């Protein structure tokens, strides 16, 4: 049975003081049993958060890592092996802000996906369509292509050690969110695409929904059969709100 997961993407938010406060708040949360909880702070604060959450049952991930697994001459980047050494468990790959603003291609993201796995990290592959693509009826085509890029490069078994997060680009940071049924329809299509190649991988991979998830709508979203939790943005910056979302996943 798939374990529910709630992941908090802090994006480029936080100061030393606010990260201490948020980490302490998270550490004091009463977490539901059986829910995997992880947070993704800016890389500058990763070790601080790992130390602050030691023994609290919350994993830490990175928002980005380099295309090569090992350290080397790549100015400004962080190797996934370095992240693994300091205690990270996960790394985000392919978030829409990196696809669209930074311009990361499928080829680059595939390199990052493979480097993360080689270093012992679990990649969280982010996929999703823009508003124009949804209005054109191309949601499943776009999401399917983004999935196929990884499958074509590494095979379906690559998703035996990965998490998939469906984040419609039009719902990220906008206050808009897909309806539970809209989200479920896409999640079901993702699982069906995987199942056509490997039923066991499809049945076991965690599929998260992201896009303006809040405590108020989390329970309804997480109640859908193919939605295994959420990748949370703004709401993860408030320990009480994030805790409420985690409890919704536990129910």
Swiss-Prot record:
Reaction equation(s) it catalyzes: D-glyceraldehyde 3-phosphate = dihydroxyacetone phosphate
Q: Show the PROSITE patterns listed in the entry.
A: TIM_1 (PS00171), TIM_2 (PS51440)
Keywords assigned by UniProt, alphabetized: Cytoplasm, Gluconeogenesis, Glycolysis, Isomerase
Supply the Gene3D superfamilies for this chain. Aldolase class I
Superkingdom in the source lineage: Bacteria
Q: Indicate where this protein resides in the cell.
A: Cytoplasm
GO terms classed as biological process: gluconeogenesis; glyceraldehyde-3-phosphate biosynthetic process; glycerol catabolic process; glycolytic process
The record's GO CC annotations read: cytosol
InterPro entries recorded: Aldolase_TIM (IPR013785), TIM_sf (IPR035990), TrioseP_Isoase_bac/euk (IPR022896), Triosephosphate_isomerase (IPR000652), Triosephosphate_isomerase_AS (IPR020861)
Q: Which family does it belong to?
A: Belongs to the triosephosphate isomerase family.
Q: How does it assemble?
A: Homodimer.
Its biological function? Answer: Involved in the gluconeogenesis. Catalyzes stereospecifically the conversion of dihydroxyacetone phosphate (DHAP) to D-glyceraldehyde-3-phosphate (G3P).
- Stated name of the protein: Triosephosphate isomerase
Natural source organism? Pseudomonas entomophila (strain L48)
